Amino acid sequence: MRNEMTGADPILRRFEGAATAGAAMTDRMPEASPARERPRRDHRRSNPSRTGGGAKRSRWLAPLLAGSAAAVAAAVLYNLRQTKAAERRHPPIGRFLHVDGVRLHYIERGRGEPLVLIHGNGTMIQDFTVSGLVDRLAERYRVIVFDRPGYGYSSRPRGLSTPRAHARLYRDALEQLGVEKAAVYGHSWGTLVAVALALQSPELVRSLVLGSGYYYPTLRADTFLLSPPAIPVIGDAMRYTISPLVARAVLPGMIKQVFRPAPVPERFDRLFPKPLMLRPLQLRAAAEDAALMTPSVMELEHHYGELTVPVTIITGADDQVSDVGRQSERLHRELPGSEFIALPGLGHMIHHLAPDAVIDAIDRTAQRSREEAGYGAAESAANPPPAAL
């Protein structure tokens, strides 16, 4: 079970050992002793100012170093304990699949046409279960949701950071699950994975619904705020010491921001496993996603016209995270035949705030793909489109 939880992060094990050793070392560190005065035998050799300065420095430097080491060790141990407590409280809810050296945590619900849901930055499978989307869609689809690499209980090797890399992993994972063709819904950062999957494996993706996405490069404050823990070595130290503490302080405000102008739903506040978001490995995943978001769309934007599947673009009209005009509306203009839906008065988290609209978009886009595939009358009768909600 340890490999499914904190043991999956090798850096965590090293920090745990180092923190324990550091705490023990600071307990044993002797206090700085006052410098002994030596008789001056040769006034030409002595330097009173230098000798006195060195003694003063030794009196404050040793306690300062000891205090700093103790503070770092205490922060590491506190964060490790918080990580273990979060995982005890919120254990894995699905199964594990090993794909291309990556351990993927996933759930599968329902029967019918395969439908893959891809979550955004900072979240995990529960983003779709808590919203009620999974249970409702499972009434007529085979719903598959993965924790993207580094989130929830999926591992994240170094280098597995771009939407295209995630799309290749999804393709291989779906092949292991026997999925030959699937409808796909991506939300926020997950829209980039969904688009990359449709571009790289058009034979696999039947239809595409893109929710609250980011598709064109613009300056975003969150990319600068979230990126530092992605820096090798320095970022590793940050995410085991100060980053979880800072994230814990700012998380309530960030959650309010993604739901604005609507309030945070009581169900989300009560059921979503927020402590899992503060673990070091997940902070690294979120930081890497933030750092690579703009470079990723700079590459992907040149290929949107190559999409060959039915596409629906859905967003909250008052999204406080992704600029609707510069992102969703522009993509709609550049994708002939796409459908665009802007939900008035809603922000970024549309599947929580308007699940009926998201489900309807998934159903109608999947039906368009059936019609474009030329289903015969017998097939249409056997698989009628779901009633509009």
How should these model regions be labeled?
Residues 107-109, 145-186, 360:
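Active-site loop/oxyanion-hole signature of alpha/beta-hydrolase fold enzymes
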